[in-house]
Amino acid sequence: MPISVDKAVIARLKIQGETFEILVDPYLARDFKEGKNVPIEEILATPYVFKDAHKGDKASEKEMEKIFGTSDPYEVAKIILKKGEVQLTAQQRREMLEEKKRQIATIIHKHAVDPRTGYPHPVDRILRAMEEVGVRVDIFKDAEAQVQDVIKALRRVLPLRIEMKVIAVKIPGEYVGRSYGEVRKFGRIKKEEWGSDGSWMFLIEIPGGVEEEFYEKLNALTKGNAQTKLIERKGL
């Protein structure tokens, strides 16, 4: 169900000396700008394009055709979202910024380790370091796409090494059913084979920061009966 007009915010695009506005759900608009597949109909509070949303002054089909090459309000709305700016409230901007920072810090926690210890830095420590170095985070850009730049900045105050680990695992047949899907969530299966007793043997490549979590999950799934061996550590 689309957001109500009173809770929507304005997305605005100034182009060729003209201004076009739409009323949008701020959070779905953010997701759309990040590149997520969000139907435009769900983002819009109303299926109209305005010259001035506050006054209710709608853009004519002729104006839209001239500037955008189409009079379809949904297609025009997509262009406004992609190229324009979403007018967030101060609270929305603050909430989205904190959420994005935590997403980035969590990714770094999973993929990077402290080279002095081989263990990942806690998320809160990474967040504090981000504040210390004054990392600039883009609310409307996907978290994954910002990680490398953030890591470069953090290395001024926080020792970090991007690391992947390859682990050999053997899971007894009686636990394979419950383990198969869960294990694959951690990383990429590089090689696998099945034993005559139904056991599952495989090599999995996982981010260095989730190694401990991976072992804990395996133990829970197999009641401690999984066999593991660290085969390779790869710094990136």
Swiss-Prot record:
One of its GO terms (biological process) is cytosolic ribosome assembly. Pfam families: SBDS_C, SBDS_domain_II, SBDS_N. It comes from the Archaea. Belongs to the SDO1/SBDS family. NCBIfam families: RNA_SBDS. This is Ribosome maturation protein SDO1 homolog. It comes from Pyrococcus horikoshii (strain ATCC 700860 / DSM 12428 / JCM 9974 / NBRC 100139 / OT-3).
